[in-house]
Amino acid sequence: MTRISRGYIARRRRRKTSLVVSSSGASLSKLITQQEIKALASSDRDRDRQKRDFRCLWITRINSVIREGWVSYSYSYSKFIHDLYKRQLLLNRKILAQIAIANKNFLYLISNQILKSEVNWKESAGVI
């Protein structure tokens, strides 16, 4: 019985997977396929991880600017966010981090207004 070549279909499929895994030094299609599966799993995992990492970075930036001491002695990120929600000032953390990096004075202005309105509210309610 004579040998029949399969044609270009398998070669085209292997070339396509080897282009996806471009850094592959292996010529074995099995290793290339395994690398492709691992790369796709890593990219899927790291898309979710990237969201967490950026949120953590934004929180760290906001907290460092708030704790510099201009605002209040015991003021922290958690109290700042709590006061923002109490005043219904819904600014997301990405925007607050950009404000903290680009224009610290504006963030101090926001936090001082929050603290002043809290003091005024306590005075009018007779708490102090």
From Swiss-Prot:
A single Gene Ontology molecular function, please?
Answer: rRNA binding
| Record keywords, A-Z | Chloroplast, Plastid, Ribonucleoprotein, Ribosomal protein, RNA-binding, rRNA-binding
Cross-referenced SUPFAM superfamilies, in alphabetical order? Ribosomal protein L20
The primary site where this protein sits is plastid
Extract the Pfam families matched here. Answer: Ribosomal_L20
Q: Which GO terms describe its cellular component?
A: chloroplast; ribonucleoprotein complex; ribosome
What subcellular locations does the record give? Answer: Plastid, Chloroplast
For this entry, list what GO says about its biological process. ribosomal large subunit assembly; translation
Q: Which domain of life is it from?
A: Eukaryota
Family according to the record:
Belongs to the bacterial ribosomal protein bL20 family.
Q: What does this protein do?
A: Binds directly to 23S ribosomal RNA and is necessary for the in vitro assembly process of the 50S ribosomal subunit. It is not involved in the protein synthesizing functions of that subunit.
Protein name as it appears in the record: Large ribosomal subunit protein bL20c
By which gene is this protein encoded? rpl20
